[in-house]
Amino acid sequence: MAEQHRLRLGRVSIPGQAYHIITASHGRAPVFADIRVARAVIGVIGRMHQDGWLHSHAWALMSDHLHWLFTLGERASLSATMNRFKSGSGRQVRAERPDLARVWQDGFFDHGVRRDEDLRAIARYIIANPLRAGLCVNVGDYPWWYAEWL
């Protein structure tokens, strides 16, 4: 609980603000290595974009965590948006993998992108995660990433 409180300290939720979010699977289990689970999570990311909760700029779904760069929409706060994502994706994942009691760890890390920061540079950092983790030799070889500029 104290860990969760520290995650929330200083959190500011501003519609139209870009955020880099990192959220992990429960117990850092490699559940997203399962193609069915990865597709379920990616489907919810797409629906949240289509439904106007946010505007996705880039994301990389790793085996045990998600990096996501988006601009927050007008519909809800950052915390409410992430709660919707985690609950919706959790339901979809458990439909594919009923053996998973929990999908996500509590909380998430967020970085509000400053005006002087380059969204494309952050997107490059995000999509290079599979390279740095040794999961692929070329970004294009890793299936679970997106960047609107590529």
Where are the model-predicted features located?
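Short catalytic/metal-binding and nucleic-acid-binding patches
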Residues: 1-150
